[in-house]
Design a protein with these regions (language model features):
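Terminal amphipathic helices with adjacent charged low-complexity linkers/tails
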Residues: 40-56, 65, 77, 228-232, ...
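A glycine-rich dinucleotide-binding beta-alpha-beta segment and adjacent secondary-structure elements
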Residues: 57, 69-135, 163-176, 295-298
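Rossmann-like dinucleotide-binding core of oxidoreductases
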Residues: 1-63
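Internal hydrophobic alpha-helix adjacent to the cofactor/substrate pocket in enzyme cavities
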Residues: 141-162
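Glycine-rich phosphate/pyrophosphate-binding beta-alpha loops
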Residues: 131-139, 195-197
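Mobile "lid/hinge" segments at catalytic clefts and subdomain interfaces of large enzymes
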Residues: 175, 183, 187-215, 220-222
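A glycine-rich phosphate-binding loop feature that marks nucleotide/adenosyl-phosphate handling sites
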Residues: 32-39, 100-109, 161-178, 192-194, ...
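Extended, charge-enriched "interface" segments that sit outside catalytic cores
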Residues: 193, 210-298
Length: 298
């Protein structure tokens, strides 16, 4: 099934403005701070009053049923107002609402009372993760969940907690921010929060975290040896590229021109050549034979 785009209009906005006092968020029924990056539709109308329309996504909820989810239209308005809001949208004039929107408000622990292991400082042996720690988002919750679970298990075995540093992983940045700075709104992990973001890449996560995983037993000896072998092969390939030079010949020039790539003025070692954004290992294999797996090349 396909997804579709649609937009709010002035009638939608007027219905919302006329009923703001009935909204849980604007009527004073809820006092908590909502997530910054997914505001309700009434929040959008108030905060971005200069916008003539807001984009919405119509998403199928199932391959087997005719239910659709209206993404970007979250609200805490009463049901009768929701009916008017939905029917004001072009294309949904005759839509039937099967599940009405609603707002939730929940309590959260002050993350300053949580240890870097995600154990509570006040209640020993209580490990928490996710929204209750003041975060928002699936990945944020999952990241805390695996750390909390690992550390709860380690504590049962009287072993030292797993504490990831800010230079180790985004999880390390997230937890460090929470337990040292606290938060006054639902916390989201952003790349801009990580000062080591250039080395916290998806393609080196296995090598970054392999020793931790091995020490706490979350990977097998066989998996660990495979990672060590991969690391050794990467070092071997890097050294080879640094020690071998591409000399500019007529044949080399022809290959560069055929690929619409500027020909180097002088010979370069392959490692330095790879620093050019248009050069890949696949292109370099026009000149040398690399007998390494794709995993190592990546």
């Amino acid at each position: 099934k396909s997804c579709y785009l649609l937009y709010t209009n002035e009638l939608t906005h007027q219905i919302i403005r006329d009923n703001l006092d009935k909204s849980a968020m604007y009527g004073g029924y809820a006092t908590g701070v909502g997530p910054r990056y997914c505001p309700s539709i009434e929040d959008k109308i108030v905060r971005f009053a200069d916008k003539e329309r807001h984009q919405l996504f119509l998403e199928p909820e199932s391959l087997y049923y005719d239910d659709w989810y209206l993404q970007g239209f979250s609200t805490s308005m009463p049901e009768d107002v929701q009916e008017k809001m939905v029917h004001s949208l072009h294309g949904l004039e005759n839509a039937e609402i099967t599940k009405y929107a609603y707002a939730i408000e929940y309590d959260a622990i002050d993350p300053l009372q949580i240890k870097p292991s995600l154990e509570n400082k006040v209640l020993e042996n209580l490990f928490t993760a996710g929204q209750i720690n003041g975060t928002s988002g699936y990945e944020e919750a999952a990241g805390q969940g695996i750390i909390a679970g690992i550390n709860a298990s380690l504590k049962v075995d009287n072993k030292e907690s797993l504490i990831l540093k800010r230079s180790d992983a985004y999880i390390g940045v997230l937890i460090d921010d929470l337990v040292t700075k606290g938060t006054i709104e639902p916390y989201r992990m952003l790349t801009s929060r990580a000062e080591f973001r250039l080395i916290l890449r998806h393609d080196n996560a296995d090598l970054r975290l392999r020793h931790y995983a091995h020490d706490i037993g979350t990977i097998t000896e066989e998996q660990y040896k495979r990672l060590l072998d991969k690391e050794e092969k990467i070092k071997e390939l890097t050294k080879y590229l640094q020690e071998n030079t591409l000399h500019i010949t007529s044949e080399v020039t022809k290959i560069f021109n055929e690929n619409n790539i500027n020909v180097p003025l002088t010979g370069l070692n392959y490692y330095d050549l790879l620093k050019r954004p248009e050069i890949t290992l696949k292109f370099i294999e026009n000149f040398i034979n690399l007998t390494y797996t794709d995993e190592v090349k990546e």
